[in-house]
Amino acid sequence: LATGLGISSVVIALAAQDIAKSFLAGISIISDRPFEIGDYITVGDLSGTVEDITFRTTRIRNADDQVIVLPNSVLSDNNIINSSKRDCRRFRIVLTLELDTPLKKVTQLTENIKLALTTHPQVINETVKVFFETISADGIDLSIDLKTSALEYVDYLKFKEEINYTLLDMVNQAKIGLAYPSQSIYLKKD
């Protein structure tokens, strides 16, 4: 009987310790406010929109519309990325042009892309970088990197779509082909 009571006491003490840790973490979250209801956060491999914050737990809803209940102690023990607090979003793409593209066309396309991007109203101009990055077996890589003021996810998707259409149109107007990975297979006669 004494052994049973001893084990029960240890289990209760451990449970109380976890509850106390989550409660103290909840107080810290509520006072420090690293995120608020409605913010989109990432904790470890979990991401979602914060729906509720209590002293013991935080509820987030993920992209699959599932509610995840996290003990606040888990939040306090991990890095929290609050995507709702950012000032801008990064857009990066690499265009791979055909290897036989004349250098003059590559240079002109690079300059035209820079001009088009720096005049776009949602592009933060000083962040635009367009460079002839490398020559690979697949083709000539143009690296395009910038930041945009389109913060909301749907707005960002629309921005990306618009930029991708613009880039594709510019490549087509320059009469430059986009490269794609290919392989040559040589058959040997015996």
Model-derived features: positions:
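Soluble accessory domains appended to multi-pass membrane transport proteins
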Residues: 27-124
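Hydrophobic transmembrane alpha-helical segments of multi-pass transport and channel proteins
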Residues: 15-19, 100
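Short, acidic/hydrophobic/Gly-rich beta-strand patch recurrent on exposed beta strands
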Residues: 12, 59-61, 143-145
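Solvent-exposed, non-transmembrane regulatory segments of membrane-associated proteins
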Residues: 81-83, 89-92, 97-190
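Small-residue-enriched core segments of transmembrane alpha-helices in multipass membrane transport
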Residues: 2-15
